[in-house]
Structure formats: C-alpha cells, structure tokens
Regions:
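Conserved beta-strand segments of alpha/beta enzyme cores
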Residues: 22, 42-43, 77
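Short beta-strand elements at the ligand-binding edges of bilobed clamshell
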Residues: 38-49
Length: 115
C-alpha cells in the first residue's frame, strides 16, 4: 500500500491535516517494523506467525481425543511510531472489552525480535 500511495504522488505519515495518509498495518516483520521506525506506518498490530506450531499442537491434542481450552490466546503486541496513543480498546470473542497497550517502537526492540 505504501508503494502505491507514494507512486500516486501522495505522502504517508500521521499529519492528516496536511494531506498525509496514515497507514496502519498488521505486518510486524522486520521490514514492516522498519517502516514504523521510518514513520511510514503509524501503528503496526502484530499477527504472530510463530503461533502456527502452537495451533498444530492443539490440533494434535484434539485428534487424540484430548480436551483443550475453548480459547487460546496468542501473545501479540501493538507498536507505534510514537507515544501518541497509549492503548487501544477492543472487544474479544467473549464480548468483553479489553485494553491493549501500544508500545512506541525503538531500534532496540526491533533488533531483539525473532521475525
């Protein structure tokens, strides 16, 4: 999306009042998070690719006739270019509201990530 926006002669960023287009993503790979640091993505919500092995384990338990918890949560984070937004409120699958912290991204955080 960023390439298409820039190819159209537009600018990505958080200054909406001056015509910038704010990009929010769910690509928390190193490349996606680098765009957060560079100010091209304002907020990046993690969709953890490391959950695959955990899901496979749960499927094997079900196939073996074992009981598993109805809800299984994935450890994920929300990263932002700055500290403007402290948290995001969302409703979970049980119709409960929950606050999710937003972490201002730093190079140190990016360097320590597995993907």
């Amino acid at each position: 999306a960023i390439d298409a926006i820039e190819a159209a002669g537009k600018t990505v960023g958080s200054d909406i009042a001056n015509g910038e287009i704010m990009v929010i993503s769910f690509d928390t790979t190193h490349a996606g998070l680098q765009d957060v640091l560079d100010g091209k993505i304002e907020c990046d919500v993690e969709c953890n690719p490391l959950h695959g092995p955990r899901a496979e384990e749960l499927i094997k338990k079900l196939e073996a006739g074992e009981d598993i918890d109805k809800l299984n949560y994935v450890d994920e984070e929300i990263f932002a270019h700055d500290d403007t937004v402290k948290s995001v409120k969302a409703t979970n699958s049980l119709d409960e509201e929950k606050d999710f912290d937003v972490t201002p991204l730093t190079q140190d955080i990016l360097d320590k990530r597995a993907y």
